A protein has these predicted regions:
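Conserved class I S-adenosyl-L-methionine
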Residues: 1-38
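A short, conserved alpha-helix within the catalytic core of class I
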Residues: 118-128
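A short acidic, Gly/Pro-enriched loop at the edge of an enzyme's catalytic core
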Residues: 101-110
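Class I SAM-dependent methyltransferase SAM/SAH-binding core
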Residues: 42-44, 50-98
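Conserved catalytic/acceptor-binding region of the Class I
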Residues: 129-130, 135-213
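Short catalytic micro-motifs in class I SAM-dependent methyltransferases
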Residues: 113-115
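Conserved Class I S-adenosyl-L-methionine
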Residues: 185-275
Length: 275
């Protein structure tokens, strides 16, 4: 049984919305073509966070549902939808393990945007299988750096990730934390396709959608990116959070007086399993 820790992303919701790099600009077209999406049917986005995927994909469906256990993430998702003028999303505060009861189907597509690994994976995948309409799809979506060639630098210096992570370690120690405990181990075998293959879905398809080659971010966006991670969320720093932020800003100013950086989050990996 997965135990939910409500402090995992404490203070991170707004940073998650503004600090995470976007998935491939071709994601909607890829899913529409692969799954025959035509504006009908229902979408369920599990572990939706501040609605990054939910809001992007909602226009491909008649109705979308964003599900997340964190009320602050849900609130950010609502704001994001309102900002974009999207009115066909229902927001549900619940865990993936609460399915199907928390958000009954049927659904044409159920997505997990970098969230599947937080769940009781086999149990949740089997629940999703029952919730999908015939021919529906479970889709895992994530950034995948290193899966393809790195594009040429468009000009600004790259984000100095190693130096920022050294600052995180300086403040928080070498053992990564999440909420009130240790961060989950980094997956070493796959990104979930091995788990899905053990369920009724069988072996999924894996597709790479080209990432943004010329993504440029400013200092505050880079800092928000780090505050959006469970292992460097604001609450972990306690009363030293402003000192950490100041050091990161000083480091970034030294690397780029203009305050802009090139970010290459990688291509977008899509793991697609049909019912």
């Amino acid at each position: 049984m997965v135990r939910y820790d409500p402090t995992i992303y404490d203070g991170a919701a707004v940073h998650y919305r503004y600090g995470r790099p976007a998935y491939s600009p071709g994601l909607e077209a890829l899913l529409a073509e692969e799954l025959g999406l035509d504006g009908s049917g229902r979408l369920l986005d599990v572990g939706c966070g501040p609605g990054i995927l939910t809001v992007r994909l909602a226009r491909l469906f008649q109705e979308a549902v964003g599900l997340d256990p964190d009320p602050k993430m849900i609130a950010e998702g609502r704001r994001a939808a309102e900002d974009r003028g999207i009115a066909n999303i229902t927001w549900v505060q619940a865990m993936a393990e609460d399915l199907p009861g928390a958000a009954p189907g049927p659904y044409r597509v159920v997505t997990f945007g970098s969230s599947f690994w937080w769940t009781d994976e086999v149990r949740v995948a089997e629940a999703v299988h029952d919730m999908l309409e015939p021919g529906g799809a479970l889709v895992l979506i994530m950034h995948k750096a290193g899966a393809g060639a790195v594009p040429p630098n468009p000009g600004p210096p790259p984000i100095p990730h190693a130096e920022i992570e050294a600052l995180v370690e300086k403040y928080l120690g070498s053992a990564r934390r999440a909420g009130q405990g240790a961060a989950p181990p980094v997956r070493t075998r796959s990104d979930g396709e091995d788990v899905i293959a053990r369920t009724r879905f069988g072996v999924p398809r894996v597709i790479l959608a080209p990432g943004l080659p010329d993504l440029v971010r400013d200092t505050e966006s880079v800092l928000s990116g780090y505050f959006s991670f469970s292992w460097s969320a604001p609450h972990l720093f306690g009363d030293r959070v402003e000192a950490f932020a100041t050091e990161v800003r000083e480091l970034l100013r030294a690397r780029s007086p203009e305050g802009v950086f090139w970010d290459w989050p990688g291509d977008t990996k899509v793991i697609l399993a049909r019912k």
